[in-house]
Every structure is written in structure tokens, then in C-alpha cells.
Regions:
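Membrane topogenic/interface segments and analogous intrinsically disordered interaction regions
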Residues: 1-250
Length: 250
């Protein structure tokens, strides 16, 4: 049975089996995109690894196992593939979770997918160019007079890639808020009214996500998070007004 994306204008809703088949198709497409992107990223993994170790300067990480460098090589290739395949993965995800959109509403997918990819890329770039250059020297120099820092490549890559990934995810906040505003879960007034509480939550997120305990690195992450929250309010306002106009609410 061939399944397809159904709109609210169709009389018969999708059955449970059809939903499962639709999910299967979306997952297969996402996995295929990830595999192809990972194979492609293998061509640039060595260069990517060299870029990731730049924040360490002359303090190159060490490999303490015979296969550790090989494992890290393919892990980084997988991460590169995930980044390259992100637009396809996001598109497949959105196409599955919003099958009830009207045809004229589906054009928003053309905006959401590139916007999500752009925000994720901005988050990754911010982590690499702003947070890591400030965090790595601090960690390397902390108690350096009595402790010699010798990081393994596995620990270092886990720190770097984890930070870049989660900051990229955090940068998706405006789109999530805009979607919630579209559903009517939140409103611009609610977001603005709770701005002070949002600052507290942002501070907690920055404290958890920042790899160092110093306030400078925490502030480096808090600033863009506050700006993202303000952008979320603006997007929620635009979406909320469109929603009110479409439903005839005054």
C-alpha cells in the first residue's frame, strides 16, 4: 500500500498502519541521507579533525589506544554527515509530524527547513569561533602550575563535538517558539511577560552547557541566548498575527 501526505481537506484520515508506513518511509529517507552524507564527509574528515584541534594550539591531544584514532576518525565523519544531512532529516521529520496542514500552509516548510539548518549552523559556528577559543585555554591553564594537562583525543572530541551540537540545538529555539505560537500554546504577550523568568532559565542553561565554571564563558553563551529569546518573541508575534487573521480572531 502506497502512503502519501494527506491534508485536512481529505475526508478519510490516515489509519494507524498508514501512519506507521509513512514513518517508515521518512526514516528510510533520513537514514539514507545520513549514510550518503557520512560517506561524502569521509573525504574531508582529516581536515575537519585538524580544524577541531586548532583551539588547543600546540597542546595536541593524545591517543592511548591502538584503535582510538580510527574510532575518532569515523565518529567525526559521522558527525560531519549528520551536519550535511540535517536539512533532509529536518524536512522528513516536519513532513511526518504535520501531515494535517492545508496545502497553502505547506509552503512554510520551504522556510522552516533552510531556517532550521541556518540556525543550527550558526550555533555550531558560535561554539567553535567564540566559545571554544575562550574555554579551551582556560581549561588547559587551570591549575597548570601543579597539574600537567594531557587530554586524550576521545575526551577532547567528546567535549568539542558535544558543545557544538548542543549549542546548535539551542539556536533552534526561535523556530520551536514560533511553532508553539502557531499552535496557540504560547503568545507573544506571555513570552514578554515572563522575560525575567526566561533570563533565569537562560542563565541555568548557560551554566550547564558551558564547559568552564568562569562567568566570562557563561556570559558569552547567555548573550546570544537572550537575543534568540527576543527573536523568538518577534517570530511569535508575526506568527500569532497571521494565525489571528486566518481564524478571524479580533
Amino acid at each position: 500500500m502506497r502512503t502519501r501526505l494527506r491534508t485536512m481537506s481529505e475526508n478519510r484520515p490516515m489509519t494507524v498502519l498508514e501512519h506507521l508506513m509513512e514513518l517508515r518511509q521518512r526514516l528510510i529517507k533520513a537514514v539514507l541521507a545520513l549514510i550518503i552524507a557520512t560517506l561524502f564527509s569521509l573525504l574531508f574528515t582529516r581536515r575537519f579533525l585538524a580544524l577541531l584541534t586548532v583551539p588547543m594550539g600546540d597542546n595536541l591531544p593524545q591517543a592511548i589506544g591502538p584503535t582510538e584514532t580510527i574510532v575518532i576518525y569515523f565518529k567525526v565523519a559521522l558527525i560531519g554527515g549528520l551536519i550535511l544531512a540535517m536539512p533532509v532529516i529536518v524536512y522528513q521529520l516536519i513532513s511526518f509530524i504535520v501531515p494535517g496542514l492545508y496545502p497553502h500552509e505547506r509552503r512554510y516548510l520551504r522556510i522552516i527547513v533552510p531556517a532550521a539548518s541556518l540556525l543550527f549552523a550558526l550555533g555550531v559556528a558560535f561554539a567553535y569561533y567564540v566559545m571554544l577559543p575562550a574555554a579551551i585555554p582556560f581549561l588547559l591553564g587551570f591549575m597548570g602550575d601543579i597539574i600537567r594537562q594531557q587530554w586524550t583525543i576521545e575526551k577532547y572530541m567528546s567535549l568539542v563535538t558535544g558543545l557544538m551540537f548542543w549549542v546548535g540545538v539551542i539556536f533552534e529555539t526561535p523556530l520551536v517558539v514560533a511553532f508553539l505560537a502557531y499552535l496557540g500554546v504560547v503568545s507573544p504577550g506571555m513570552l514578554w511577560k515572563n522575560f525575567r523568568y526566561a533570563i533565569v532559565v537562560i542563565a541555568i542553561i548557560a551554566a550547564v552547557a558551558t564547559p568552564t565554571p568562569d562567568p566570562i564563558n557563561m556570559a558569552l553563551l547567555m548573550l546570544p541566548l537572550v537575543l534568540l529569546y527576543l527573536l523568538s518573541i518577534l517570530l511569535a508575534l508575526l506568527v500569532y498575527r497571521r494565525r489571528e487573521a486566518a481564524t478571524g480572531i479580533t
